[in-house]
């Protein structure tokens, strides 16, 4: 299998119509925006794209639509996470048949299985396809289960297509331990930052990044990522600090803040599905004022 190098991966939101159906017209426009503004690859539907609020059939249709719309311009990483192993494996097979370039999954939601069953969960999903297979180590309070370096090494031994780990746990010691051992077991094993805090991740050995904020600040993210890949970590710090400020601004509202920020930048993608709650008018206006006041965003695109 040729080495998979995802680079800077943009994570589009899932646009919804006023009656909360997937808005495929706007999804196509959003995909084009990301491709035209620095994405090396796209991943969807991720948690930033409200994947847990999409029905199984909707996930399949979104992946099919994205593959056709991208039309080979960039690789698509299909996110197939589910609490059920067989459900996630079936979605992975569907994504491969649709034309995805790689598969991404996290630990099973809600359940807290023992390590041997987390290993089995990942192994069955990865074995369902021949594509590069990526595991996402999410924060434990979100995922419900913790991924260990030992478990990842066992998965390397079982799966030839296990290509790398996406980490958004911010557990730097875990990342250090994993990359030191994993690259001995599998040269070329990918460590991918699951957040925009790329400077710290790059210092450990991350070579790619998933970026939910790419819809807001694609130029800033591209600049920071390129400096990190050139090992110019000191020079990347200023951009990293600006990105950290943007993350902090949007953190409390999560997807609702992300969608409100997109609307403020002229790329309205609707509001989140329940149980998430959209920002009220006052909160959205306050967010718009804060975004407009950020000097780091002055060179970022407005509109589509």
Predicted stretch roles:
Residues 2-146, 301-302:
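Active-site beta->alpha loop and helix N-cap motifs at the rims of alpha/beta catalytic domains
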Residues 27, 59, 63, 88, ...:
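A general structural signal for well-ordered alpha-helical segments in protein cores
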Residues 127-128, 139-251:
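Catalytic alpha/beta core domains of metabolic enzymes, predominantly
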């Amino acid at each position: 299998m040729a080495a998979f190098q995802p680079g800077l991966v943009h994570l589009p939101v899932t646009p919804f119509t006023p009656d909360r159906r997937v808005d495929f017209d706007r999804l196509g426009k959003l995909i084009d925006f990301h491709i035209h503004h620095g994405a090396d690859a796209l991943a969807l539907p991720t948690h930033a794209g409200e994947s847990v609020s999409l029905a199984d059939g909707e996930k399949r249709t979104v992946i099919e639509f994205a593959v056709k719309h991208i039309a080979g311009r960039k690789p698509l990483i299909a996110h197939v996470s589910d609490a059920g192993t067989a459900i996630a494996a079936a979605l992975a097979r569907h994504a491969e048949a649709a034309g995805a370039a790689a598969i991404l999954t996290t630990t099973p939601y809600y359940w807290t299985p023992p390590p041997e069953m987390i290993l089995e969960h990942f192994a069955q999903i990865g074995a369902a396809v021949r594509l590069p297979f990526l595991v996402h180590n999410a924060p434990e309070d979100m995922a419900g289960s913790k991924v260990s370096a030992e478990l990842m090494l066992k998965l390397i031994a079982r799966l030839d297509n296990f290509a790398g780990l996406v980490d958004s746990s911010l557990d730097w010691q875990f990342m250090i331990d994993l990359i030191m051992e994993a690259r001995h077991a599998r040269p070329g094993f990918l460590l991918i930052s699951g957040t925009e805090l790329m400077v710290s991740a790059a210092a450990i050995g991350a070579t790619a990044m998933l970026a939910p904020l790419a819809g807001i600040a694609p130029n800033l993210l591209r600049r920071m990522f390129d400096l990190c890949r050139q090992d110019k970590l000191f020079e990347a710090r200023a951009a990293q600090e600006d990105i950290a400020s943007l993350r902090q601004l949007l953190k409390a509202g999560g997807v609702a803040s992300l969608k409100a920020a997109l609307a403020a930048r002229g790329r309205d993608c609707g509001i989140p599905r329940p149980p998430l709650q959209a920002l009220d008018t006052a909160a959205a206006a306050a967010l718009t004022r804060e975004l407009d006041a950020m000097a780091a965003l002055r060179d970022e695109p407005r509109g589509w």
